[in-house]
Amino acid sequence: MKWTFILAVAAGGALGSVARYLVGIGFGKWLGPKFPWGTLFINVTGSLLIGIFAGLFAVRWSLPQAARIFLVVGICGGYTTFSTFSLDTFYLIERGEMASAAAYMIGSVVLSVGALIAGIQIVRVI
């Protein structure tokens, strides 16, 4: 275990978490709290971002491992919110909003995987 990797995760995680918080608050103020649009947006854009990083690491970027860990594990890990997604789904189900819960689950997974694929494809094209 290298301390540089731990510090990279901590620093990136702090930045990603702050970004997630600000985006979530912004969406809540913009669209209201009834549906977890902020979490959906965060998961989709986080998947796009990690796809772009993966694509760049594979073909273009020759970054040190600590930098890769900072970007992917730190920033993307701090930014994406799968655990929050699970809790938001539970709340929708608990309120009896089964159609919203199903749409949210399917939409989150399909759009996030699609965004990851798009991120990799973007890098392959440019």
Curated annotation (Swiss-Prot):
Regulation: Na(+) is not transported, but it plays an essential structural role and its presence is essential for fluoride channel function.
Keyword check for Transport: yes
Record-annotated membrane-spanning stretches: 5-25, 39-59, 69-89, 103-123
Residues annotated as binding Na(+): 77, 80
Topology relative to the membrane: Multi-pass membrane protein
Reactions catalysed, as given in the entry: fluoride(in) = fluoride(out)
GO terms for MF: fluoride channel activity; metal ion binding
Pfam families: CRCB (PF02537)
Disulfide-bonded cysteines: none
Record keywords: Cell inner membrane, Cell membrane, Ion channel, Ion transport, Membrane, Metal-binding, Sodium, Transmembrane, Transmembrane helix, Transport
Keyword Cytoplasm: no
Subcellular localization: Cell inner membrane
One example of a Gene Ontology biological process annotation: cellular detoxification of fluoride
GO terms for cellular component: plasma membrane
Family: Belongs to the fluoride channel Fluc/FEX (TC 1.A.43) family.
Function, in words: Fluoride-specific ion channel. Important for reducing fluoride concentration in the cell, thus reducing its toxicity.
Name the record gives this protein: Fluoride-specific ion channel FluC
Organism: Nitrobacter winogradskyi (strain ATCC 25391 / DSM 10237 / CIP 104748 / NCIMB 11846 / Nb-255)
Gene name tied to this protein: fluC
